[in-house]
Regions:
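Short, compositionally biased
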Residues: 84-107
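Short, basic/aromatic beta-hairpin or loop at an interaction surface
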Residues: 43-58
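Residues that flank catalytic or metal-binding motifs in active/ligand-binding sites
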Residues: 38, 73, 94
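Glycine- and charge-enriched low-complexity intrinsically disordered segments
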Residues: 103-124
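Extended boundary segments
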Residues: 1-47, 119-120
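Short alpha-helix capping/helix-loop boundary micro-motifs
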Residues: 60-67
Length: 124
């Protein structure tokens, strides 16, 4: 079954450089094996990366054994929905590319919360 975005449309690519996604296919695709629900396409910020590291999830350090290049500020990445929600609750949520964010995210986060942090192409 095709993964859809939060609007019910085809899921757009989040990032191919760095190559992101649970399946490392550039999209925030998911299935039942994705226990972390890596479904939110974010644009990482320095504040968010610091928050994530201080919360025990270091996204900045490369981990080649997991095919993980490390995330830098300004890069797009498929983030776990619960991690985004935690950052949101702590006023550190990164911007979100809604068209590339999987509709499964809505099981954890409301569309209104995502829209508050929506990144639009005109802002790039």
């Amino acid at each position: 079954m095709e993964n859809k975005n939060v609007f019910g449309d085809s899921l757009m690519i989040c990032s191919e450089n760095p190559l992101t996604g649970y399946f490392r296919d550039g999209c925030c695709n998911t299935d039942d094996t994705d226990l972390g629900l890596h479904t939110v396409c974010i644009i990482a910020s320095t504040d968010f990366l610091i928050f994530s590291t201080e919360s025990g999830n270091d996204l900045s350090t490369p981990r080649p054994e997991f095919n993980f290049p490390g995330v830098k500020s300004g890069e797009k990445w498929c983030l776990c929905a619960l991690r985004w929600k935690e950052a949101y609750q702590n006023n550190c949520a990164p911007m979100v590319v809604l068209e590339a964010t999987n509709e499964k995210t809505l099981e954890v986060v409301t569309l209104d919360e995502l829209i508050e942090h929506a990144h639009y192409k005109a802002e790039i």
